[in-house]
Amino acid sequence: MWRGLGLALALCLLLTGGTESQGQSSYCKQPPPWSIKDQDPMLNSYGSVTVVALLQASUYLCILQASRLEDLRVKLEKEGYSNISYVVVNHQGISSRLKYVHLKNKVSEHIPVYQQEENQPDVWTLLNGNKDDFLIYDRCGRLVYHLGLPYSFLTFTYVEDSIKTVYCEDKCGNCSLKALEDEDVCKNVFLATKEKTAEASQRHHHPHPHSHPHPHPHPHPHPHPHPHHGHQLHENAHLSESPKPDTPDTPENPPPSGLHHHHHRHKGPQRQGHSDNCDTPVGSESLQPSLPQKKLURKRCINQLLUQFPKDSESALSSCCCHCRHLVFEKTGSAITUQCTEKLPSLCSUQGLLAEENVIESUQURLPPAAUQAAGQQLNPTEASTKUSUKNKAKMUKUPSN
């Protein structure tokens, strides 16, 4: 069960790709020493699984994240995952420092919220982190996962499942600080999962009497990989030695260490990640959406941007338009961004849900719709501009007129 969990995490990482070289990766390494005032949070939590959340008190989404983190702590504790330390580090900026108390009030006394001083080395920078990142360390203080948006949203289960993986698996090798009580928790979870799997298998293969001479086939359920991380996440994950889906004969050997991705959230507008396009262009097998992508695509997009290509753009002849999607999740008021990984001629900048939030989005190109192809229309390039015009609540990729 846990090996499958690690595989699900690893597959998502492979989809997003890393930007940091293997030599620079901090995977399975202790972080640089950092402290706030006279407190050393990593030292204080040594011996327990440690979850460090980088939240910004001036950000509405971060306030929601803090509240959900408290809910997650309670949930995991009820399930027996009690040996976990949670640490929240507020942003160093003046606006965040002024709202520190508001952030602190969103969690209980079990989750300390640390406020950086203005003149101290920035902890976020030391950890190569950004807003809404989650860093998960094992009991020996070694970094196992670094999750960034969108996978650090606590409305997903990626953070939760990553914590459980670190709790029960020795991703970075043996740690002598693992307690017997923790071993018992993991064994109980494994046995419970095994029993549920066996029961589901029995129900699936149990023949049902039919009056028809030809019984109806039962649809096969599609497995949902538990957590993954990905996209702009400084993630340091070890690939599971489990075989990949649809390749049952793959030998169970761990991959080379070069596949331990450390995903960087880029400082500038050039960002990589999953495309949220579920309507894959014809003849483009490489763009077939994965399970994690399909999961993201279930959410409705409410914003669409139409891009203008420069005249010398190679994509202009093969694309009817280029659009960016800004996903908004129900009941959360929070937004995430999906992009494609291919090289594109332009970037789009849109206003976020809040006035101070700017969302940088990569354009995703499509082949012309059937109507465009039938009419033999091509993209009518405008002046060498890379700006995008926002079309709120646009549903379709529109064909430009000549």
From Swiss-Prot:
- In the record, which residues are listed under signal peptide? 1-19
Residue positions, PTM Phosphoserine? 284
**Per its UniProt entry, which superkingdom is the organism in?**
Eukaryota
Chain spans, region 13 X 2 AA tandem repeats of H-[PHS]:
204-229
Q: Which keywords accompany this UniProt record?
A: Glycoprotein, Phosphoprotein, Repeat, Secreted, Selenium, Selenocysteine, Signal
Q: What does this protein do?
A: Constitutes a major selenium pool in the brain and may play an important role in developing and/or modulating the morphology of neurons and/or glial cells.
UniProt protein name:
Selenoprotein P
Q: What organism, scientifically named, is this protein from? A: Bos taurus (Bovine)
